[in-house]
Amino acid sequence: MSILFNAYPLARPALFAMDAETAHEVTLASLQRAYDCGTTRRWLHDQPQLPTTLMGMTLRNPVGLAAGLDKNGAFIDALGNLGFGFVEVGTVTPRAQSGNPKPRMFRLPKANALINRLGFNNQGLDAFLANVTRSRFRSQGGILGLNIGKNADTPIERAADDYLIGLAGVYPHADYVTVNISSPNTKNLRALQGGDELSQLLAALRDKRAELAQQHARQVPLVVKIAPDLSQEQIDIIADTLLSNGVDGVIATNTTLSREAVQGMPHAAETGGLSGAPVHELSLAVIERLRQRVGSALAIIGVGGILSGQQAREKIAAGADAVQLYTGLIYRGPALVGECVGTLKNTAR
């Protein structure tokens, strides 16, 4: 295994001495330099593999990168070399936006958690697509998911317009498209998870996808990312709505607004979505309920609080077909990818 994998625990104190968002940027820039120098070429080959079928696609393994780490699709190739079975980038909005004021990302180390209120900060669809089309990841067999959202200044009643623009833009370049309706950092966005609102949005996206599928001679799977802060009744309504509108998969889950697991910790009162270890059990409950409701009709990608191979296994056992990592990478480093794949491979024997 590359020395850079083993060096992350040594580098972490220096990174954690920085502002969380600055450390994020420094880490991505360092990874890109390592990729450009050829240092990362062996990483992918060093990782255990576990071929997995997901929504008709063949993944090298069922451990993916969650959206949010690379919002602008600028580091796809470098991230793809860490051994992920699939990579998801975004969320991208039609127009560039700066997001919420800084500071807007906070670590809670005692809980292996993170709070962010970034607010879909990104360079916009045109810049995003320029980065995606420059990437070689897909041409080398990688599976790429592109995550779309709405601009903060788009009225919620016009949200479908932004998603339709996003879908049309990313469609030719995506192996699957994720519709992000669950970030807590865009005002009223989670209202789109309601039955009527969700049904109207998905009906519009379904019709647009049919048009794009004919135009591009291929049907790209459509996935919806949902929140963990849902009642069982709400989960059932969402599941039924996804099924009735021809959606292919669901990502469970996004960040939580709950602070029950981190009360009293520094930064716990900050506004934003909480990710990391405290989300694991919440995500498991949503996955279990979804699987009970949809049977095998929908693919489920489990995300939230995976900091070990065992927790990846628990997501799969709860009903997920694949998993994604984000905050766990901040606390554990890139070695977490191989650990999760290895654990799942051993479980499958």
Swiss-Prot record:
GO cellular component: cytoplasm; plasma membrane
Superkingdom of the organism of origin: Bacteria
Annotated metabolic or biological route of this protein: Pyrimidine metabolism; UMP biosynthesis via de novo pathway; orotate from (S)-dihydroorotate (quinone route): step 1/1
Protein EC: 1.3.5.2
Recorded topology in the membrane: Peripheral membrane protein
Disulfide bonds listed in the record: none
Localization per Swiss-Prot or TrEMBL: Cell membrane
Reactions this protein catalyses: (S)-dihydroorotate + a quinone = orotate + a quinol
Binding residues for substrate: 71, 116-120, 180, 185, 254-255
Enzyme's top EC category: oxidoreductase
Cofactor or coenzyme needed: FMN
InterPro entries: Aldolase_TIM, DHO_dehydrogenase, Dihydroorotate_DH_1_2, Dihydroorotate_DH_2, Dihydroorotate_DH_cat, Dihydroorotate_DH_CS
Major place of residence: membrane
Note accompanying the cofactor annotation: Binds 1 FMN per subunit.
Gene Ontology BP annotations: 'de novo' pyrimidine nucleobase biosynthetic process; 'de novo' UMP biosynthetic process
GO molecular function, one term: dihydroorotate dehydrogenase (quinone) activity
One Pfam family linked to the record: DHO_dh
Family: Belongs to the dihydroorotate dehydrogenase family. Type 2 subfamily.
NCBIfam families for this protein: PRK05286.1-1, PRK05286.1-2, PRK05286.1-4, PRK05286.2-5, pyrD_sub2
Subunit structure: Monomer.
Function description: Catalyzes the conversion of dihydroorotate to orotate with quinone as electron acceptor.
Protein name per its UniProtKB record: Dihydroorotate dehydrogenase (quinone)
Lineage: Bacteria, Pseudomonadati, Pseudomonadota, Betaproteobacteria, Burkholderiales
